[in-house]
From Swiss-Prot:
Cofactors: Zn(2+)
Gene from which the chain derives: hisD
Co-factor remark: Binds 1 zinc ion per subunit.
Enzyme Commission (EC) number: 1.1.1.23
Pfam families referenced in this protein's UniProt entry, alphabetically: Histidinol_dh
Free-text function comment from the UniProt entry: Catalyzes the sequential NAD-dependent oxidations of L-histidinol to L-histidinaldehyde and then to L-histidine.
UniProtKB keywords: Amino-acid biosynthesis, Histidine biosynthesis, Metal-binding, NAD, Oxidoreductase, Zinc
Name recorded for this polypeptide: Histidinol dehydrogenase
GO biological process, one term: L-histidine biosynthetic process
Active-site residues, Swiss-Prot/TrEMBL: 327-328
One GO CC annotation: cytosol
Organism lineage: Bacteria, Pseudomonadati, Pseudomonadota, Gammaproteobacteria, Enterobacterales
C-alpha cells in the first residue's frame, strides 16, 4: 500500500500546470476493441442466438440452452435474499420511487394566438433494455436506478440482461421493480442482441446501463447504426470533487474520497480547500483509514490519479470546480448552500457533513447514473425524462390559419421554399371561395 501525500498549491502553478492537474485518467482509443466489437455486432445481426451462444461459451465459459430466465426463477429468488437486505432494498426502492415520481411533467396546452393551439405531451418509450454488468458483488442498486424510472414512465416492456450466472439479488431487485423479461447474456454480444433482437430476444428502443470497455463501445456502435437504438450515455471512470473549509470534518472527507476511489483504479478524487491545516488532517486520515480497507491496493492506484488542491479562498474552489465539472460534488463547508448558488457544472451534488456520496449511490432517492468526464457541462443525471419522449401537437382553426397565413407566406418565400408557400396559398384560396 502506497502512502498518499499529494497537496498542490493552485497559485504556485502556471496555467498549463493548472490545466494538467485537472486532467482525468486517459481513456485509450483502442482500435482492437473497436474491431472486435464490430465483428461481434455483425455476427449477432446475421446469426442471432447461434452466435450469442458461441460468445457465451467463449467469454462466460458456460453453455446456455435458454437465455431467458423463467418467471419461476425470478419469483423464487426471494428465498435466497436475506431479510435485512430485502428491507434495505425496499427503503431504497421507496425513496427512488418518490423522487422519480415527482419528476412527472405536466403536458403543455396553450393558444399562442387566437385559433392557434400548441401542445406538448410526453409518451413512454415502448421497450427499453437494461444492462447490469457482473462484478465482485451484484450491482442490484443499478437495477433499482434504471428499472424504477422505466416503470414509472410507463414503458410497456422492460428487458434486463446480465452475464450468467445472474445473482439472486439481481433477480429479486428486477422482479420487485417490475422488469418484464430477464436474459442471461453479457458483454458486447448482449448489447447487440438488445439492439437488433433475435428469435427469442426482443429488440429494444433504448439501452441503459454501465459496463466495461467492450460494452461501452458496443453501445456507441449500435446507436450509430441506422435504425439502431438510442442509449443513455457513455459512462467513464467515476469521479468525486470535494469543496471543504476549516469547519469540515477531515475524517468524513477522507472517507468520502476513499469510497469513490474504491470504484476502480481509474477513478479520480479531488479535494479543494483554502485550509492547509484541513488538507494535512485529511491526508493523515486517508492513510489511517486505507490500512483497514480490503481493496487498499486498488484504492491506492486510484489515488495516483488524485490530488488535494490548496486554494486562496472558497471562491477559487468554486471556479476550479466549475472548470472540472465533476460527476459527484460534495460541498462540506460552514454554509454549503451559499456555495451551491455559484455551482454551474456538476452531475450530482451533496451538501453538508451528513450527505455522503454513498447516499446518492444507493438510497437517498436521486439517480446514480451520471455524466462523467466533464460532461456535466451540458448533460444531466439520468431521470424520468430519459424514459419518455416529447411529442408536439398543433391545431389551427380556419380563422387562426387565416390570421397566421400572411406570416407563413412571407417566411417561406424568404427561404425560397415554394412548396411551403403553396401549401398555405391553396388553403387561403379555398377559404376565400367559401366566403
Amino acid at each position: 500500500m502506497k502512502y498518499f501525500n499529494t497537496i498542490v498549491n493552485w497559485n504556485m502553478l502556471n496555467s498549463n500546470e493548472q490545466k494538467n492537474i485537472l486532467l482525468r485518467p486517459v481513456i485509450k482509443n483502442n482500435n482492437s476493441i473497436k474491431k472486435k466489437v464490430k465483428k461481434i455486432i455483425e455476427n449477432i445481426q446475421v446469426l442471432g442466438e447461434k452466435a450469442l451462444r458461441e460468445y457465451t461459451i467463449l467469454f462466460e465459459k458456460c453453455h446456455i440452452n435458454k437465455f431467458e430466465v423463467s418467471k419461476e426463477k425470478m419469483l423464487s429468488s426471494s428465498l435466497y435474499v436475506n431479510q435485512s437486505l430485502k428491507d434495505a432494498i425496499s427503503t431504497a426502492k421507496k425513496n427512488i420511487t418518490s423522487f422519480h415520481t415527482a419528476q412527472i411533467l405536466s403536458p403543455i396546452d396553450i393558444e399562442t394566438q387566437v385559433g392557434v393551439r400548441c401542445q406538448q405531451i410526453y409518451l413512454p418509450l415502448n421497450s427499453v433494455g437494461i444492462y447490469i454488468p457482473s462484478g465482485i458483488a451484484p450491482l442490484f442498486s443499478t437495477v433499482l436506478m434504471l428499472a424504477i424510472p422505466a416503470k414509472i414512465a410507463g414503458c410497456k416492456q422492460i428487458i434486463l440482461c446480465s452475464p450468467p450466472p445472474i445473482d439472486n439479488t439481481i433477480l429479486y431487485a428486477a422482479n420487485i421493480c417490475g422488469v418484464d423479461k430477464i436474459f442471461q447474456m453479457g458483454g458486447a454480444q448482449a448489447i447487440a442482441a438488445l439492439a437488433f433482437g433475435t428469435k427469442n430476444i426482443p429488440k429494444v428502443d433504448k439501452i441503459f446501463g454501465p459496463g466495461n470497455a467492450y460494452v461501452t463501445e458496443a453501445k456507441l456502435q449500435v446507436s450509430s447504426i441506422f435504425n439502431g437504438p438510442q442509449i443513455d450515455m457513455l459512462a467513464g471512470p467515476s469521479e468525486l470533487l470535494i469543496i471543504a473549509d476549516e469547519a469540515s470534518n477531515a475524517d468524513f472527507i477522507a472517507a468520502d474520497l476513499l469510497s469513490q476511489a474504491e470504484h476502480s483504479i481509474s477513478s479520480q478524487v479531488i479535494l479543494l480547500t483554502p485550509s492547509l491545516q484541513l488538507a494535512k488532517k485529511v491526508i493523515i486520515s486517508i492513510n489511517n483509514q486505507l490500512k483497514n480497507l480490503s481493496k487498499s491496493d486498488d484504492i491506492s492506484t486510484a489515488l495516483d490519479n488524485s490530488v488535494i488542491i490548496l486554494t486562496k479562498d472558497l471562491f477559487e474552489c468554486i471556479k476550479i470546480s466549475n472548470i472540472y465539472a465533476p460527476e459527484h460534488l460534495i460541498i462540506q463547508t460552514k454554509e454549503p448552500r451559499l456555495i451551491l448558488k455559484e455551482i454551474l457544472n456538476a452531475s450530482s451534488i451533496f451538501l453538508g457533513p451528513w450527505s455522503p456520496e454513498s447516499a446518492g449511490d444507493y438510497a437517498s432517492g436521486t439517480n446514480h447514473v451520471l455524466p462523467t468526464y466533464g460532461k456535466s457541462v451540458s448533460s444531466s443525471a439520468l431521470g424520468l425524462c430519459d424514459f419518455k419522449k416529447r411529442v408536439l401537437i398543433q391545431e389551427l382553426t380556419s380563422q387562426g390559419f387565416i390570421n397566421l397565413s400572411n406570416t407563413l407566406k412571407i417566411l417561406s418565400e424568404a427561404e425560397k421554399l415554394e412548396a411551403h408557400k403553396n401549401a398555405v396559398k391553396i388553403r387561403v384560396d379555398f377559404l376565400k371561395e367559401k366566403i
